[in-house]
Regions:
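Metabolite-binding pocket within alpha/beta catalytic cores that recognizes anionic/polar moieties
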Residues: 1-137
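Active-site rim beta-loop-alpha module in soluble metabolic enzymes
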Residues: 128-161
Length: 161
């Protein structure tokens, strides 16, 4: 094993960009990396696949996280140690509002923290809200297919809980 590489993601300092896109599914990494200029496969270890390239002249990366908060936490902590500091989680989800249609882009402005992982980082009372500067940037497209609102992550629960 190479001691300079992070244990789970197998990435070393400097191999990733400051900005990292985080899909859950490892197979999505290659698809996303196609939009980079000169993408390079950096690592492929378990559920963690990482590509780095440039986009509009900026070094960017994509790393899969697998499913769930604990796996995403591992990826982000190790990526941070390698120089990343801005993460965009992308993926699919279910919805409960009838006006949100399949294929709509939903940008979460906040989250209800009903799971266990984030409690290890901040008290449950601490609001999980988006960075307002980046949130404003994400809405620049003005598309009617973009939706803004809150998301909810929760541990498994029974219907009548």
């Amino acid at each position: 094993e190479d001691a300079s590489r992070q244990y789970h993601i197998q990435v070393a300092k400097g191999e990733v960009g400051r900005y990292v896109i985080l899909p859950g599914d490892p197979k999505r990494c290659a698809k996303i990396a196609q939009y980079f200029d000169d993408p390079v496969l950096i690592a492929d270890n378990r559920e963690y696949v990482t590509y780095t390239g440039t986009f509009d002249g900026v070094k960017v990366s994509v790393t899969s996280t697998g499913i769930g908060g604990p796996f995403a936490s591992i990826a982000m902590e190790e990526l941070y140690r390698c120089g990343a500091d801005t993460f965009v989680r992308i993926g699919i989800c279910g919805g409960m509002q009838p006006e949100v249609k399949s294929g709509d882009v939903v940008i979460a402005t906040g989250a209800v923290r009903m799971e266990g992982t984030t409690r290890e980082y901040a008290p449950i009372e601490y609001p999980a809200v988006a960075n307002q500067e980046r949130e404003a940037w994400s809405g620049e497209s003005g598309s009617s297919r973009h939706r803004y609102g809150y998301s909810c992550s929760c541990r498994g629960h029974k219907k009548n809980d």
